[in-house]
Each structure stands twice: as C-alpha cells, then as structure tokens.
Amino acid sequence: SAPDMTGPDGKRARTAYTRYQTLELEKEFHFNRYLTRRRRIEIAHA
C-alpha cells in the first residue's frame, strides 16, 4: 500500500464516502453482507 494511504499507526486511512456511495453500499449490503474488494472499489469510483 502507498505510504500516504496509512495513518501514523500504520493502519489504512478511513475511506470517506459520498451520500450516493453510502446508499449504494447499503443496497449492496442488503443483498450480500460481504462485498468483494473489486465491488467496493467500483462503488468508490462511482
């Protein structure tokens, strides 16, 4: 992972989602509790 993606404690930075992205994530979660990494990335780029 890129150095700017981690916080001071070495953990990955929290992703901030827009309202639209949050709604999409909630819809996906309703049907499938375990989103694939690929699907999370697709929603993040929406």
Curated annotation (Swiss-Prot):
UniProt keyword Transcription present: yes
InterPro entries: Antp_homeobox, HD, Homeodomain-like_sf
Disulfide links within the chain: none
One GO BP annotation of this record: anterior/posterior pattern specification
GO cellular component, one term: nucleus
Cited CDD domains: homeodomain
Domain of life: Eukaryota
SUPFAM superfamilies: Homeodomain-like
GO molecular function term, any single one: DNA-binding transcription factor activity, RNA polymerase II-specific
Pfam families the record matches: Homeodomain (PF00046)
Keyword list, A-Z: Developmental protein, DNA-binding, Homeobox, Nucleus, Transcription, Transcription regulation
Keyword DNA-binding annotated: yes
Compartment annotation: Nucleus
DNA-binding region(s), chain positions: 10-46
Main location group: nucleus
Function: Sequence-specific transcription factor which is part of a developmental regulatory system that provides cells with specific positional identities on the anterior-posterior axis.
PANTHER family according to UniProt: HOMEOBOX PROTEIN HOX, HOMEOBOX PROTEIN HOX-B5
Family: Belongs to the Antp homeobox family.
Protein name, per record: Homeobox protein Hox-B5
UniProt organism field: Ovis aries
Designated gene of the protein: HOXB5
